């Protein structure tokens, strides 16, 4: 599935990662909320810590980009950060289109996933697959084609830049490359 060039593209370029984005007060709030969830790991406990954030997005309609909104459920202490990130993506020169976006999703393994704590976001999963460690098996989604498929997230895209600026990790560098995934 992946050529050597493609494999290199899956590794997150740290040039957009902003270590200065870490705010100790914000991190303490996030840690406090995640600790509450960990103390009683269940959907009800986690759901009580989440908020729905309305975000500006570009949609594709008949091949044209049109303004719209979407909602993503995240941990309340990172809601403003999420709003800022998606506003930057929306205002970026790329006008990156978002077909679907997901955040909080309780998993049966509890806090084994950042989605269970509301600190992860997936964007356009059909066009931004998760690839197994073998580099060939697509676990979720379809072919990753930045520059060809408008929904695929390129490594130098406005999406990667905005999340990196705010100190989020891109799943592209995971052992199971997860192109759709960003986490705090």
Identify what each model region corresponds to.
Residues 1-42:
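N-terminal low-complexity, Pro/Thr/Ser-rich intrinsically disordered segments
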Residues 18, 57, 105, 143, ...:
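Residues in intrinsically disordered, low-complexity segments of regulatory proteins
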Residues 36-44, 109-112, 154-155:
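Intrinsically disordered, low-complexity boundary segments flanking structured domains
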Residues 10-18, 79-90, 146:
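A broad, low-specificity signal for short, low-complexity segments enriched in glycine/proline
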Residues 66-76, 110, 144-152:
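Second-shell loop/turn segments in exported
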Residues 2-3, 113-184:
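Catalytic cores and adjacent binding grooves of peptidoglycan-active enzymes
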Residues 27-99:
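Active-site acidic/histidine clusters and adjacent loop/turn architecture
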Residues 83-133:
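Active-site-adjacent loop/helix surface patches within enzyme catalytic domains
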């Amino acid at each position: 599935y992946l050529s050597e060039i493609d494999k290199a593209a899956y590794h997150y370029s740290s040039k957009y990662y902003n270590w200065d984005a870490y705010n100790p007060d914000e991190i303490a709030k996030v840690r406090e909320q995640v600790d509450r969830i960990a103390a009683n790991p269940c959907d009800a406990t986690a759901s009580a810590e989440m908020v729905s954030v309305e975000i500006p997005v570009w949609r594709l309609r008949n091949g044209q980009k049109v303004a719209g909104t979407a909602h993503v459920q995240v941990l309340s202490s990172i809601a403003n950060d999420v709003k800022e990130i998606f506003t930057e993506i929306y205002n970026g020169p790329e006008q990156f289109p978002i077909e679907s976006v997901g955040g909080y999703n309780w998993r049966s393994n509890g806090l084994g996933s950042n989605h269970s704590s509301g600190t992860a976001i997936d964007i356009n999963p059909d066009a931004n697959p998760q690839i197994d460690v073998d580099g060939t098996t697509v676990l979720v989604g379809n072919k990753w084609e930045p520059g060809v498929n408008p929904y695929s997230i390129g490594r130098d895209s406005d999406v990667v830049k905005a999340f990196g600026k705010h100190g989020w990790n891109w799943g592209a560098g995971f052992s199971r490359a997860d192109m759709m995934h960003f986490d705090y």
